[in-house]
């Protein structure tokens, strides 16, 4: 069994954190060999990588299994698809995004249907994919891990300090709701326009998220689009299918969360009692303002349990075991 590492760089935002964490978790398995072929860069680098990928795939046999990150850039996908059909080895993509579900068009679902097994985000994404492939070929990761090497520092919790943290890509194109008058969030991330906002605390290295571990009764927010009344637009609608990585970021730091009540991850949050599913920002603020410290501490204890699993890679590890066991019978 092989894991294709397609990375050769890091960034301050969390865009590639999930791929790096998957690599680190897969590297712990004695029966999984990591193959390092960067699939990013300029024209020359892509030509070199195409040759390396083709050479590697030529050596695979029908008993071999290749796990890789999805989506994969088109030229490399075409190479992989060609050798997959030719040599009959098995391929298992770990889905990070499906462009057609966030208004990007394309035919990701058709490509995924050609795979031998697929690692999906959650039941809602699986339901969508099952229109194109057999559901028994789809495994859910439930939530992305967020590996953190150190323990979470103790956070002083008092009812004198309470607030909501929003982290990620702060571009107006993606989350213009944060620029709405009256939205009083503590902000972390890139592409923020109002740098003089005292509640904008800059960006941080995705590998070291301790900066968001602020004192008080703090929550993380999962919300996208241009409205405070609902999640709207392509990015807002995408929450109905995907697992936003910022959810794992917040939980890794033991922060309970607020999430849109129509988001695919809402059931996970509510079922594990690690936050609230809300229909509007106003509803969220009412909960924050009225919450007792006893209630917050109870939710925080639940969050610590999930946080430990996320920080140590339990969710990808569990779904990897499912994939390995299932492929043994095929």
From Swiss-Prot:
Gene from which this protein is expressed: wbbI
Primary subcellular site in the record, as a coarse category: cytoplasm
Keyword Cytoplasm attributed: yes
EC number: 2.4.1.-
Pathway: Bacterial outer membrane biogenesis; lipopolysaccharide biosynthesis
Keyword terms, alphabetized: Cytoplasm, Lipopolysaccharide biosynthesis, Transferase
Protein name in UniProt: Beta-1,6-galactofuranosyltransferase WbbI
Lineage, highest ranks first: Bacteria, Pseudomonadati, Pseudomonadota, Gammaproteobacteria, Enterobacterales
Any one Gene Ontology BP term: lipopolysaccharide biosynthetic process
Any single GO CC term annotated in Swiss-Prot or TrEMBL for this entry: cytoplasm
């Amino acid at each position: 069994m092989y894991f294709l590492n397609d990375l050769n760089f890091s960034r301050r935002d969390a865009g590639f954190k999930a791929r790096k964490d998957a690599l680190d978790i897969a590297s712990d398995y004695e029966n999984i060999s990591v193959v390092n072929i960067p699939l990013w860069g300029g024209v020359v680098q892509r030509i070199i990588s195409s040759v390396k990928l083709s050479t590697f795939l030529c050596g695979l046999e029908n008993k071999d299994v290749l796990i890789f990150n999805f989506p994969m850039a088109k030229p490399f996908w075409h190479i992989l698809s060609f050798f997959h059909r030719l040599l009959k080895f098995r391929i298992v993509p770990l889905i990070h995004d499906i462009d057609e579900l966030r208004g990007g068009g394309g035919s990701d679902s058709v490509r995924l249907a050609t795979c031998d097994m697929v690692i999906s985000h959650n039941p809602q994404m699986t339901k969508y994919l099952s229109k194109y492939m057999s559901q028994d070929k789809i495994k859910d990761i439930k939530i992305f891990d967020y590996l953190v090497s150190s323990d979470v520092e103790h956070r002083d919790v008092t009812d004198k300090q309470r607030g909501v943290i929003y982290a990620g890509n702060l571009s107006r194109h993606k989350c213009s709701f944060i620029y709405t008058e009256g939205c009083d969030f503590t902000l972390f991330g890139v592409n923020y326009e109002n740098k003089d906002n005292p509640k904008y605390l800059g960006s941080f290295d995705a590998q070291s998220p301790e900066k968001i571990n602020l004192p008080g009764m703090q929550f993380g927010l999962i919300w996208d689009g241009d409205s405070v009344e609902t999640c709207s637009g392509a990015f807002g609608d995408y929450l109905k299918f995907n697992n936003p990585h910022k959810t794992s970021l917040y939980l890794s730091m033991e922060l309970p969360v607020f999430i849109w009540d129509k988001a695919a991850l809402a059931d996970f949050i509510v079922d594990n009692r690690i936050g609230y599913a809300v229909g509007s920002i106003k509803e969220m603020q009412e909960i924050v303002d009225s919450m007792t410290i006893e209630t917050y501490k109870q939710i925080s204890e639940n969050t610590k349990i999930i946080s430990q699993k996320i920080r140590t890679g339990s969710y990808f590890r569990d779904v990897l075991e499912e994939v390995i066991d299932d492929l043994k019978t095929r």
